[in-house]
Amino acid sequence: VALTKTDRVAAARVEEVRAEVEQTLRELGFDAVAFFPTAAAENIGIAELRSHLLQLAERPRPQQQRFRLALDRAFTVKGAGLVVTGTALSGEVRVGDTLWLTGVNTPMRVRGLHAQNQAVEQAHAGQRIALNIVGDAQKEAVHRGDWLLSSPPPEPAERVIVELQCHTPLSQWQPLHIHHAASHITGRVSLLEDNLAELVLDTPLWLADNDRLVLRDISARMTLAGARVVTLDPPRRGKRKPEYLQWLHALAAVGADDAPALELHLQRDAVRLE
């Protein structure tokens, strides 16, 4: 957290604001947060903040996973054709790769790549990417919220079990605005136990385990909660049975650790490998 313009106030005010922000973050579940008091005009704290951000950028990215990129823009360039942009959530992509474009449900070949405004031969998770793609799709058929994927996906999810991190308590079957990557839809929440809930989506989403979502009130004025995907397409009945809830709690606890998550899925049934 960067506290800006600290040269404009007394040191006591800086500490007061820091304590307020720290308390708010603690209530939201962020217990260990780095604070950087800064004053750009005086070059105070800038070097420390820059060093911290560079360290964050060097953290390992999920490049061994399948490539997933959420599209937020599509346009045409004279002499090149269709170009789409978005942020890669996982995996990596190279010029010449063939990716699956949802929405039009067709394969597209990557003819060119730009990452962070530079022409590159490959790009990876965490980067903003522009892809010049070639295939049986026109710009008018490509929409914000479509995905480029390394392989044809299973059907999008209409219902999903999530782990909630609430800023404001939610009520049973409350209507919500739901944000996921570049998608914005509506749906309802069915509370299960503790911080577990089922989201029933008005429009299916291309989700994966551990994806993050933002939940806002139906007037779209207030952010109510964050959510993390625990499992997709839950059973329509029996979600409140003790054994199923126990399984969900165990699955939520392992987070993004693939090996124990796979073991838990195998305890219940076969695993779909698409």
Functional labels for PLM-detected ranges:
Residues A19, S51, L69, P260, ...:
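Short, contiguous clusters of charged residues that form electrostatic/catalytic patches at enzyme active sites
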